[in-house]
């Protein structure tokens, strides 16, 4: 099925869905609220509903029991920033510019010194939702650029409590400043200063602060009778892993498990508030993660990717297959499991559909509208593309995944103890040199072999059939692809968070060094 026919088919499926919701009729009711819960480095196997044996996620498991579980839901990239850019634009990072051309097949993101960020030419989800009267808030990690022009309130959000990057540090504020925490336009402190994180004990109150921001926003918008979009993008399971005092030491899985338990408790409180306010039937909630669990973290500080190979930074299943739950009481029937191949980019198009809006017609949108899947059980045929930088590494079509390139990380890093596939290395598959397979891709049947350990024999009829179908999809994709201007090539220490807006009031302004733009170095 071509991309064009897939889009037409999706629209045909969507029309009766929108009619049923009353969104196409004159005088349609207020569109539903939208809550996207995006975790940071949480793995597919971290939830009880996906088989995690300690069963420490009762609220998320209940959310799945009351909604729809997606076992085959994917990130658009195995790293934070490109994945988030894809969610908010509905477009692959190769299209929206969140990639690097500094080296072949390199993952890149937005550290403090990055010059680039989300381009003004991209239409972000909150910008479009404003057209339908939504009030939009981001809580947590932005990660789409540090410079003033990339501020989330310049890209459709009305409120922000969080940071432009993760809680890395502590830094010395001389060579590198601590990351600021913002309330709307101005910083209100920095990580490890006004917002402490105890690296020895793992204690930090950040998740509780993020939770309270979400609850207060929901209550306020409910009182205003205004449709709202809440993008709750907390960073609790990203290393260094932290949890609040009341959750530390409560999990069988160590500090990482403590963080997961606190997240689960927070999600439960958000869902309970929606129910107690009587707005759960008019609020669509989706839970997922930005990429797979980071398996290189310290002992008991990394998550689980279940049966899948490797983790964050790789384009094996463990790096890009995510936990995903849709919840919308009264609309999504309880207890469903969908085998639709889903993507984080689908949240863009689905959210627009919920608001009664169409995606921009002047560009390619990679995200599909999943309402026909969630409300009527339809399965839409589509490929999943796995990129690393500007390199197409693999594609999944149906149950078959074809690897065009394989690489985990360099031998140099591996010998230093950096292993993205600890205890899982597969000969000829998890390679420490970049191996090209474009002529004869490694093809796996993910239904029989989710761990990507046994590639199909090149001479088998099954391989030849899968090769023919995936080759057609790859050629069509590459022929029509117009890459965006790469945003992650140039770094400059002078653009770090030395003197963010609001630093004067706090006495937190630091002196930036001389401006020296240079090529960013991306190791893997």
UniProtKB/Swiss-Prot annotation:
GO CC annotation, single: lysosome
Single annotated GO MF: sulfuric ester hydrolase activity
Record localization: Lysosome
Main location: other
Cysteines joined through disulfide linkages: 310-421, 491-520, 503-509
Residue(s) carrying 3-oxoalanine (Cys): 80
Cofactor remark: Binds 1 Ca(2+) ion per subunit.
Cofactor: Ca(2+)
Residues forming the catalytic site: 80 (nucleophile), 143
Family: Belongs to the sulfatase family.
Record note on quaternary structure: Homodimer.
Protein name: N-acetylgalactosamine-6-sulfatase
């Amino acid at each position: 099925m071509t991309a064009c026919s897939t889009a037409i088919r999706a629209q045909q499926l969507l029309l009766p869905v929108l009619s049923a919701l009353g969104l196409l009729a004159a005088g349609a009711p207020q569109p539903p609220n939208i809550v996207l819960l995006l975790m940071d480095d949480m793995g597919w196997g971290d939830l009880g509903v996906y088989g995690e044996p300690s069963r420490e996620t009762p609220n998320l498991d209940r959310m799945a029991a009351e909604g729809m579980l997606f076992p085959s839901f994917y990130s658009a990239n195995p790293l934070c920033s490109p994945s988030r850019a894809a969610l908010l634009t509905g477009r692959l990072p190769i299209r929206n510019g969140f990639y690097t051309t500094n080296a072949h097949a390199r993952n890149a993101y937005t550290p403090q010194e990055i010059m680039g960020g989300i381009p003004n030419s991209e239409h972000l989800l909150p910008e479009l939702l404003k057209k339908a009267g939504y009030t939009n808030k981001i809580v947590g990690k932005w990660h789409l650029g540090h410079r003033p022009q990339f501020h989330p309130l310049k890209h459709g959000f009305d409120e922000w409590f969080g940071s432009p990057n993760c809680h890395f540090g502590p830094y010395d504020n001389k060579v590198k400043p601590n990351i600021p925490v913002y309330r709307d336009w101005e910083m209100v402190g920095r990580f490890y200063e006004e917002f402490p994180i105890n690296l020895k004990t793992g204690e930090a109150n950040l998740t509780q602060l993020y939770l309270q921001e979400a609850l207060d926003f929901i209550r306020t918008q409910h009182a205003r009778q205004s449709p709202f979009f809440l993008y709750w993008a907390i960073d609790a399971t990203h290393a260094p892993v932290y949890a609040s005092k009341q959750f530390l030491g409560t999990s069988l899985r160590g500090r990482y498990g403590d963080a997961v338990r606190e997240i689960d408790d927070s999600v439960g409180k958000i869902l309970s508030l929606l129910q107690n306010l009587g707005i759960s039937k008019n609020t669509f909630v989706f839970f997922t993660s930005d990429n797979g669990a980071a398996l290189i973290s310290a002992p008991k500080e990394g998550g689980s990717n279940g049966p899948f190979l490797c983790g964050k930074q790789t384009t094996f299943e463990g790096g890009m297959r995510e936990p995903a739950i849709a919840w919308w009481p009264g609309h999504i029937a309880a207890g469903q499991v969908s085998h639709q191949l889903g993507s984080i980019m689908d949240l863009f198009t689905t959210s627009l559909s919920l608001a009664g809006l169409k995606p921009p017609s002047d560009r390619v949108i990679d995200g599909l509208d999943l309402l026909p899947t969630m409300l009527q059980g339809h399965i839409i045929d589509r490929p999943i593309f796995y990129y690393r930088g500007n390199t197409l590494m693999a594609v999944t079509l149906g149950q078959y995944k074809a690897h065009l390139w394989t690489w985990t990380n360099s031998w140099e890093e591996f010998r230093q103890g950096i292993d993205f596939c600890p205890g899982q290395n597969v000969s000829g598959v998890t390679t420490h040199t970049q191996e090209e397979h474009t002529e004869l891709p490694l093809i796996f049947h993910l239904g029989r072999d989710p761990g990507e350990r046994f590639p199909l024999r090149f001479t088998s009829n099954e391989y030849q059939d899968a090769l023919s179908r995936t080759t057609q999809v790859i050629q069509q994709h590459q022929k029509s692809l117009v890459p965006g201007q790469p945003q992650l090539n140039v770094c400059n220490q002078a653009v770090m968070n030395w003197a963010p807006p609001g630093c004067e009031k706090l006495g937190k302004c630091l002196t930036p060094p001389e401006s020296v733009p240079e090529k960013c170095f991306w190791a893997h």
